[in-house]
């Protein structure tokens, strides 16, 4: 887990990330199926209806999405670590005070340079317990309630 106040001056300029909308839920579902074996479906709709922001990145190298709540990512899912990093930076750019980036596992080492570059502190947290075939789950930062 990483937490703290984001150093705004260290956020990269010209991130290739845009605000998403309901039409982008199809893209999110396709990325989810590739990474976790199933789409989030109503979970994403619920997050957006309760005030979270959908962020989208897509280019020739891949695509992905993030759901941010006051700068803390609830989900980051992408087809490449580079796109996941840009999406995480875009979440942090929306910071409103302290943020938390949860569920950084060994498979998510792409997130470490981002959180350290943003001035956040790393700390250990509890385990992630899974069962069955969930897909690669990388590059992916899950939501606690909506793995």
State what each model feature region is.
Residues 1-14:
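Active-site-adjacent scaffolding segments
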Residues 13-147:
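Intrinsically disordered, low-complexity, positively biased terminal segments
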């Amino acid at each position: 887990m990483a937490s703290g106040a984001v150093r705004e001056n260290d956020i990269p300029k010209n991130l290739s990330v845009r605000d998403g909308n309901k039409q982008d839920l199809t893209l999110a579902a396709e990325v989810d199926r590739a990474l976790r074996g199933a789409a989030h479906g109503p979970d994403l709709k619920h997050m957006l209806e309760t005030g979270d922001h959908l962020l989208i990145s897509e280019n020739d190298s891949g695509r992905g999405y993030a759901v941010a709540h006051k700068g803390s990512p609830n989900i980051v899912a992408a087809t490449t670590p580079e796109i996941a990093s840009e999406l995480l930076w875009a979440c942090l750019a929306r910071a409103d005070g302290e943020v938390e980036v949860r569920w950084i596992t060994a498979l998510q080492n792409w997130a470490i340079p981002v959180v350290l570059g943003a001035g956040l502190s790393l700390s250990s947290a509890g385990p992630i317990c899974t069962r069955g075939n969930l897909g690669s789950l990388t590059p992916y930062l899950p939501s606690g309630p909506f793995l």
